[in-house]
Amino acid sequence: MRPDGRKPTQLRPVKIIRDFNIYAEGSVLIEMGNTKVIITASIEEKVPPFLRGTGQGWITAEYAMLPRSTESRSIREVVRGAPSGRTQEIQRLIGRSLRGVVDLKKLGERTLWVDCDVIQADGGTRVASITGAFIAVADAMIKLTESGKVRQNPLKDYVAAISTGIVGNEVVLDLNFKEDSSAKVDMNLVMTGSGNFVEVQATGEEYSFTQQEFDKMLEYGKLGINKLIHIQKKFIEGMPSIGHWKRLSIKEFSYTDTGGN
């Protein structure tokens, strides 16, 4: 039995509130269980020096945790003087995941900044950031297209992420902090709406896992991502094959998983 009584393939309750920030081109508050992340997408009309004159844009992500997002207060990284290795790893993961579904040439010479601020952490902050960030980025891309600054929406596909792992002797989906802390194996999976992989991170903790266990984690992860993309489609209507993307009118959506397909 899992600490919160969920089935092995059951997501925590998911809630997304759109336009959480009144200034950003795109913003959401995403909740996955007790994990809560605010995400904003901001467009800047310039690119990093290495892209100047190329006609290509860039997407970069920043990630931070509020001091009391965890059980005990942590020191702000700006006070420490530099982001930790963990923070840098997560920022790169979020950026890679979003660049995987955006045509940077169509974006033109502009930068999309994605800021992910964890206000409460209970496991899965990086995957919640990616899943929520897609909606914020999509809203920003739709606004950019409707303004006439780009000819065609740069979005290529949906993208979402989820954690899975082995806790005790059982493969489970969407680990909370207690499960993550005791997991033998932890996997983070990032996939597109068309079923392609952007990233697979799987690590054993004093444990080596079998091909069969890996396949089962992958199966559970794909199941979870399909559910999350279904939620994204409540906010964004997309037909990637013809480059059609539309912002739907819904502002808030809550989803309770029953653990089925």
Swiss-Prot record:
The record's annotation in InterPro entries points to:
ExoRNase_PH_dom1, ExoRNase_PH_dom2, ExoRNase_PH_dom2_sf, PNPase/RNase_PH_dom_sf, Ribosomal_Su5_D2-typ_SF, RNase_PH, RNase_PH_bac-type, RNase_PH_CS
The UniProt entry, under CDD domains, shows: RNase_PH_bact
Key word rRNA-binding present? no
Q: Identify the keywords attached in UniProt to this record, alphabetized.
A: Nucleotidyltransferase, RNA-binding, rRNA processing, Transferase, tRNA processing, tRNA-binding
Name the catalysed reactions: tRNA(n+1) + phosphate = tRNA(n) + a ribonucleoside 5'-diphosphate
A biological-process GO annotation: tRNA processing
Q: Which GO terms describe its molecular function?
A: 3'-5'-RNA exonuclease activity; tRNA binding; tRNA nucleotidyltransferase activity
Please report the name of this protein according to its UniProt entry: Ribonuclease PH
Gene that encodes it = rph
